Amino acid sequence: MWCHNPETQRFEQEIQYDAEKCTGCGVCAKVCPNGAVTMEDGRPKLDKKLCKLCGKCENFCTQGIREIVGQEYPVKTLVKELMKDLMFYEQSGGGVTLSGGEVMAMSTDYVLAIAKALKKEEVSLTIDTCGYVPYEKFEAILPYVDTFLYDVKVMDPELHKQYIGVDNKLILDLSLIHI
């Protein structure tokens, strides 16, 4: 199975880099003050436990392929940023999609606050979800969301358990509630 946005699966910042474009020059390992980047067989290896996200490997990468991804935003700041695109939402009939990792597994209060703020601004909200979360999380946010985009990987329960690791009954049951 494949995730269409794997760069957004974690809730904290992390270093991301394009291994195919890496030349193996080793600059990232040389400049890392914490020894988090080492070279193994001509390729950089990152020890996430040692990485302090200082950004030196990103800044000194000769190929420009390292990047710190993920950023925490207070609700007000995020909504203010999203409202910069209001003209596009109005012209296209679109809105905001919360996606990546599993939005519904995040803090319910945080997601609910974003949803309420966008509803107040009359901006359409879609949430991309796998749907594998308790119904109560959906129940609280339901009045503020226009669309739930269910990312169902496999319909067959046995294959779903084999490939994803969990049964898909909860996912399918919740998707029927929102139809």
Where are these regions (language model features)?
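Cysteine-rich micro-motifs
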Residues: 51, 55
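Iron-sulfur cluster-binding cysteine motifs and their immediate structural context
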Residues: 1-11, 27-46, 56-71
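Conserved AdoMet/S-adenosylmethionine-binding subsite of the radical SAM
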Residues: 76-178
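Short cysteine/histidine-rich metal-coordination sites, predominantly Zn2+-binding motifs
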Residues: 15-21, 45-50, 70-81
